[in-house]
């Protein structure tokens, strides 16, 4: 199908939100020509995308489906530069993310303080997106006919129930539906963006774009094409200038112009959307001139208010009789063949899950809060106290070591994955040149507000005690835990001799061989627990007592290991143009997602969020996509059933079902 040079609607960026926007609008009216421009490659039936269990491959530094942005050095990270990966493939984060189904809290969207963005306004759109593929006690808040599927996947590692029982012993109750928009403290068997019927990842592009293109001819897909700038004519966004995703000839840059008759929607993501606006002349005039760009519209908020969820991992050894995904990820050929064959036979087995089987959302008890520093206590009173639906931290259990398996000994592991739900820290991103290939001036602001440290330290301690109450537990991976003083009772401990021998087998001559006191083995459990029915342990390791030096070791570990959770947002915030308490540098968009100072231009991605959301952000990205598509439809004069914009169901072709299209 030939690509025209003019469209009715142009959607710039085919990520989680952009794919939704383009697919919906192409089904608003099949006489509308909709163009979707994406910098990455097409994800159609790419096994690195649709096979859930191999998602870690997309995070590798040589990934073809992600780009990596390096920040300025930060004293808050002990001088490190943060590395923030962003999807570089059609479908965006939905093609490569962890597939964790997590909703924000009701107060999150109310806190946007924008007309039409309250949770009561957005709930119908949340339901419209999803097909909830499990028994449901809350049918009023979930959807059952949407294009995106939600399930437990088609496999569950045994670490799931062990974690849930251990969490309960920590005062974290099991909850049937932790994504009910109101519960902020509990544990659950975690749902996933996986289609139960096929065992495939449920990404935005297959659900909205490919399904539409197989049934209608009014949606045009332009991949491997980077948005350079938006062209404004007589106060209206009229066209977009693009370049190849990678420079073909730096001395002779290649440009192409696409025009839009009715609407342009910018959806390049939290990092790239503000850069496109800045190259187009929207932003802080001083910064624009310094970068060699003529200011067009004075919007200092463009590129400010950068937010993320701060993440760190804590891996543990597990006993050899338990199952993990380590041998599969490590490259055991026999195991990989068995796992792949099972998935291609019936869509089940370890490839049909992400291995993140259970997790918690938590708020501190009054006693726990009193033990945190005064700065966080004050922040808690201001931000959390009157919003009981907001969790402070999340952590979940991963059924294996999440990281580079060439850097650790063979064996079986589990990993605690933590992230701070509502950081107080803020960052920024700005262009340094009109060149679309130039690296930006990027300060994500990780940990630059002292109030963010206390809950991170608390979560490490909390998750560590959860791990120590699990029957899987066989010691810490000491190289990936804080460097506590040698004499500290909190010191991380390796596997005990019995477990080492079980791994080594009768012919192993070195299991348990220690070099002096370099490492210390785990001691046998000694503490009795009367609550063993729910905790899964009759005998427990005693609670660790941490002193001030131990806390400093944890803080140092967090500064050296905190990273992005791939949940960045906020750089093109909705809010008053003159600014507000939550958008201090001034809003970029009005409540209908229109860019101030120009007609015909909206932004529709996570960058529009003025404040954070307590969830894995694919849920919010889809919601923003649905909301933006509805706003565009209304602006074009459509109403009623037309705004349903129902997309066709994506169906596999015969060749695709056979599994012959493998790697």
Curated annotation (Swiss-Prot):
FAD binds at residues 8-38. One of its GO terms (cellular component) is peroxisomal matrix. GO terms for molecular function: alcohol oxidase activity; flavin adenine dinucleotide binding. The keyword Membrane does not apply. Keywords: FAD, Flavoprotein, Methanol utilization, Oxidoreductase, Peroxisome. The active site is at 567 (proton acceptor). It is an enzyme of class 1 (oxidoreductase). Pfam families: GMC_oxred_C, GMC_oxred_N. Its EC number is 1.1.3.13. The C-terminal peroxisomal targeting signal (PTS) is essential for the efficient targeting and import of AOX into peroxisomes via the PTS1 pathway. Belongs to the GMC oxidoreductase family. This is Alcohol oxidase 1. It comes from Komagataella phaffii (strain GS115 / ATCC 20864).
């Amino acid at each position: 199908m030939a690509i025209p040079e003019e469209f009715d609607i142009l959607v710039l960026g085919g990520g989680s939100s952009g794919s939704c926007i383009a697919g919906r609008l192409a089904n608003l009216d099949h006489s509308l020509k909709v163009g979707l421009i994406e910098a990455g490659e097409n994800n159609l039936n790419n096994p690195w995308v649709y096979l859930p269990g191999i998602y870690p491959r997309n995070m590798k530094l040589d990934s073809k489906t992600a780009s990596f942005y390096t920040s300025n050095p930060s004293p808050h990270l002990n001088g490190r530069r943060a590395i923030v990966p962003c999807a570089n493939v059609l479908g965006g984060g939905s093609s490569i993310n962890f597939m964790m189904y997590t909703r924000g809290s009701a107060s999150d969207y109310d806190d946007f303080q924008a007309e039409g963005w309250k949770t009561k306004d957005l709930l119908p759109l949340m339901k419209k997106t999803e097909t909830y593929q499990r028994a449901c006690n809350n049918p009023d808040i979930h959807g059952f006919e949407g294009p995106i599927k939600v399930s437990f996947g088609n496999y569950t590692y045994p670490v799931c129930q062990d974690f849930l029982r251990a969490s309960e012993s920590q005062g974290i109750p099991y909850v049937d539906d932790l994504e009910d928009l109101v519960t902020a403290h509990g544990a659950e068997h975690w749902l996933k963006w996986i289609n139960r019927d096929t065992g495939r990842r449920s990404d935005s592009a297959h659900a909205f774009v490919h399904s539409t293109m197989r049934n209608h001819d009014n949606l045009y897909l332009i991949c491997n094409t980077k948005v350079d700038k938006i062209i404004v004519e007589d106060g209206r966004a009229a066209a977009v200038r693009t370049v190849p995703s990678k420079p073909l000839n730096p001395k002779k840059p290649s440009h192409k112009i696409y025009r839009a008759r009715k609407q342009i929607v910018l959806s390049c993501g939290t990092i790239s959307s503000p850069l496109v606006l800045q190259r187009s002349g929207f932003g802080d005039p001083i910064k624009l001139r310094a970068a060699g760009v003529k200011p067009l519209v004075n919007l200092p908020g463009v590129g400010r208010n950068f937010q993320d969820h701060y993440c760190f991992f804590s891996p543990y050894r597990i006993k050899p009789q338990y199952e993990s995904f380590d041998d599969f990820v490590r490259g055991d050929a026999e195991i990989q063949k068995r796992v792949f064959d099972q998935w291609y036979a019936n869509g089940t087995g370890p490839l049909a899950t992400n291995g993140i089987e259970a997790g918690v959302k938590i708020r501190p008890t009054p006693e726990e809060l009193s033990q945190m520093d005064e700065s966080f206590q004050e922040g808690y009173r201001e931000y959390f106290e009157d919003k009981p639906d907001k969790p402070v931290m999340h952590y979940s259990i991963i059924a294996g070591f999440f990281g580079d398996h060439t850097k650790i000994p063979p064996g079986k592991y589990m990993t605690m994955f933590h992230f701070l739900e509502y950081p107080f820290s803020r960052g920024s991103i700005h262009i340094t040149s009109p060149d679309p290939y130039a690296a930006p001036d990027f300060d994500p602001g990780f940990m630059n507000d002292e109030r963010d440290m206390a809950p991170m330290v608390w979560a490490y301690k909390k998750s560590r005690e959860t791990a120590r109450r699990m029957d899987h537990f066989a010691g810490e991976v000491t190289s990936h835990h804080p460097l506590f003083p040698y004499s500290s009772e909190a010191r991380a401990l390796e596997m005990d001799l019995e477990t080492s021998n079980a791994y080594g087998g009768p012919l192993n001559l070195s299991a348990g061989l220690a070099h002096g006191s370099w490492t210390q083995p785990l001691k046998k459990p000694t503490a009795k627990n009367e609550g063993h029915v729910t905790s899964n342990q009759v005998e427990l390791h005693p609670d660790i007592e941490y002193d001030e030096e131990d806390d400093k070791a944890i803080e140092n570990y967090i500064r050296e290991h905190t990273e992005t959770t791939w949940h960045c947002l906020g750089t093109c915030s909705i809010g008053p143009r003159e600014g507000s308490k939550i958008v201090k540098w001034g809003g970029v968009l009005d409540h209908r997602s229109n860019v101030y100072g120009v007609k015909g231009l909206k932004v529709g991605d996570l960058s529009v969020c003025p404040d954070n959301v307590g969830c894995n952000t694919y849920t919010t990205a889809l919601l923003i996509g649905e909301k933006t598509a509805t706003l565009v439809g209304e602006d074009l004069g459509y109403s009623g059933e037309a705004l349903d914009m129902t997309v066709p169901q994506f169906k596999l072709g015969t060749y695709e079902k056979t599994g012959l299209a493998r790697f």
